[in-house]
Amino acid sequence: MFCTSFIFESIKTDINSFDLETMIAPVDVRHLRLEFYTSSKAQFLQCAAFTDITAENYAQLISAREHALRTVPAYYALELTRAYPLSSLYRPVSFPAQVENASLMPKEEACALIRRIADFSERAVISLSVFGDPVLYPALCDVVREILKYPGLSVLIETSGLGWQESVVRDLCECARNSARTPFAIGWIVFLDAVSSGMYSQVHRVSLSEAEFFLKEATEFAMQVHAQCPGVLWPQIFRMNENEKELEPFYRTWKERVGQVIVQKYDHVCGLLPDRRVADLSPLERYPCWHLKRDMIIFTDGRVPLCKEDVHCRHALGNAFQQDLAQIWRRGQDVYLQHVRAVHEGLCGQCDEYYTYNF
């Protein structure tokens, strides 16, 4: 089987027989995460746009053809439900806590959409959440099974860790074990954000007694997933002024338990939420937005906003239930080209998420 690292793997078998010299590139483009091999549709399109690239002209060509780095979406977020069981400090208040008060994406539309995603992108990670919690979606297992029919698609479940039935977790983990793929069949992110019930109460705006119960339930859920599917669970803490003092104990605790942790930067959603950032992590020089380059967000009614920051869909690119995905994707190209020219208007001018990167 062909391996993209076969040259290094071959040299490594007898590395002392080779004279290796490390060369530092005059222009650093590592942040662009370029991969010039054709193992996916996105990479093929990228290679096709740079057939004349060399070690001498790479910086000039990439700068001149930065528009070509936006190929097809690699990350989709399907809003199966708008409901979320907690009113966390980092969540817009416009999302309801009860599923009966929230819109649901029709299962038939979701499954049809998944088939079209597989045709358009071929390889992608599909998150089953935008701001809602997929545990509240009645047909979750059916949607996951539909996604895993396609070998190029993976599932990401972002959840509070509350309200999960053991049988559902067991079924999903069994589906994952039967559908091995890269980077994972099903990945899990659990929003914990605290190690103490007092901090959990503050971050998720619940009473102390509720916090004790919820934190215990979410912790047990995380450990259940880890026990059945090790290596694909990420406990997450949103780093904010409010919970900064628990960042280190959170990291140490969960690193020891499951081996991996996500420390997520706080997103004020372009000023919609108060600024609770502990520090400004943005690069010294701004570059085009990763999310405009590789993400597509789809709301329960099929509307496609410009990005996740477009909470109220005031910059809609189209409707995924009614229009071709390629056509919708092309409509985002103009805003991306503005970023290439260092023009950041409207939401983009207030955004602090452009340098963050999804799976």
Swiss-Prot record:
UniProt xrefs under InterPro entries: 4Fe4S-binding_SPASM_dom (IPR023885), Aldolase_TIM (IPR013785), Radical_SAM_PqqE_MftC-like (IPR050377), Spiro_SPASM (IPR027608)
Top-rank lineage group of the source organism: Bacteria
Pfam families: SPASM
Name of this chain's protein: Uncharacterized protein TP_0285
